[in-house]
A protein has these predicted regions:
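Short beta-strand/loop motif that positions the catalytic acidic residue
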Residues: 160-161, 167-169, 173
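Conserved acidic catalytic loop of the alpha/beta-hydrolase fold
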Residues: 1-11
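Conserved alpha/beta-hydrolase "acid-adjacent" motif
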Residues: 149, 174-180
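Active-site-adjacent alpha-helix of alpha/beta-hydrolase-fold enzymes
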Residues: 100, 178-191
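Conserved hydrolase catalytic core segment
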Residues: 9-48
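A catalytic-pocket lid/entrance helix-loop region that shapes and gates access to the active site
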Residues: 32-86
C-alpha cells in the first residue's frame, strides 16, 4: 500500500533483525516489486534461531547473569520453555505480572544486543508502554514460529536469488547468529555479506551505521548502472 501510494513500481527494501524477515518475506511474495535488498542482522525465524536466543545453550552461555534475570519472572515449570512461559505472562489479565514480564523480556535483548551499551538508558526499561508493546508483539510472532515453515526462506530462495542484496552482520551479534547470514549468502546468487568486525546486533553501533551508509551508496550506484 505504501509503495502504491507513492506511485513506485519497484523499490529498494531494507530491514534490520526482524525487519530482515519481513523484507525477505515481502520479496518472496512480490519479487517483481523489489530492486534490491539491504539487510542488517539477518533473522530467518527458525527454531534453531529461537533456541539460540531463548534457551540455555545459546546466548545465555555468554550472558549468564542477564539470562538469570530473564528467567526470574517465570515459574519454575516454564524456565525450560521461556517462549511459552512468557507467552502466558504477557497475555495475562494480571497487569502487574504482564508489565514486569515485558520489562524483563525487553531488557534481555537490550543487554545482549550491543557492544556499545551507552544507548541503554533507564528510559528504555522504565517506559512500560514501549516495553510491553515490543515484548507482546515479538513474543507473539516468535511463539508462533513467525507463522513460517522452519526452512521457508531457503526453500523459497529461488524467487529472490537474482535480486541484488547486501547483507550486514556484526561479528559479535548475540541476538542473530552470523552463520545464518553466511548460509543465506551461500544460497543467494546475487548477495554479498559484510561481517562488521567490531559490532554486535544493535543498529546504532558506530561501525554498523558506517557500514549501512556505505551499503546504500554501493547499492545506489549499482542500481543506477543497471538502469542505464
Amino acid at each position: 500500500l505504501i509503495r502504491k501510494h507513492f506511485g513506485y513500481d519497484k523499490w529498494l527494501v531494507c530491514g534490520g533483525s526482524w525487519g530482515t524477515t519481513l523484507a525477505m518475506a515481502y520479496g518472496i511474495c512480490f519479487p517483481q516489486c523489489v530492486t534490491g535488498f539491504i539487510l542488517r542482522g539477518v533473522f530467518l525465524g527458525s527454531k534453531s534461531e529461537n533456541n539460540w536466543l531463548y534457551q540455555r545453550d545459546g546466548a545465555a552461555k555468554f550472558f549468564p547473569d542477564a539470562y538469570r534475570d530473564f528467567l526470574q519472572p517465570l515459574a519454575e515449570k516454564h524456565k525450560l520453555d521461556p517462549l511459552s512461559g512468557y507467552h502466558q505472562l504477557l497475555q495475562s489479565d494480571n497487569e502487574v505480572a504482564a508489565i514486569a514480564a515485558s520489562k524483563a523480556w525487553y531488557l534481555w535483548e537490550l543487554r545482549i544486543s550491543s557492544l556499545e551499551h551507552t544507548h541503554i538508558t533507564s528510559s528504555y526499561i522504565e517506559d512500560k508502554h514501549q516495553a510491553w508493546c515490543m515484548s507482546l508483539v515479538s513474543n507473539h510472532y516468535l511463539y508462533h514460529s513467525c507463522f513460517l515453515a522452519d526452512d521457508y526462506f531457503f526453500n523459497n530462495i529461488a524467487k529472490i536469488k537474482s535480486i541484488p542484496a547486501i547483507l550486514l552482520h556484526g561479528r559479535y551479534d548475540m541476538v542473530c547468529q552470523v552463520d545464518v547470514a553466511y548460509a543465506l549468502t551461500e544460497a543467494w546468487d546475487n548477495a554479498t555479506l559484510q561481517i562488521i568486525p567490531q559490532a554486535g546486533h544493535g543498529g546504532f553501533e558506530s561501525q554498523t551505521i558506517d557500514a549501512f551508509c556505505k551499503a546504500t551508496d554501493v547499492m545506489a550506484k549499482f542500481l543506477e548502472q543497471d538502469i542505464n
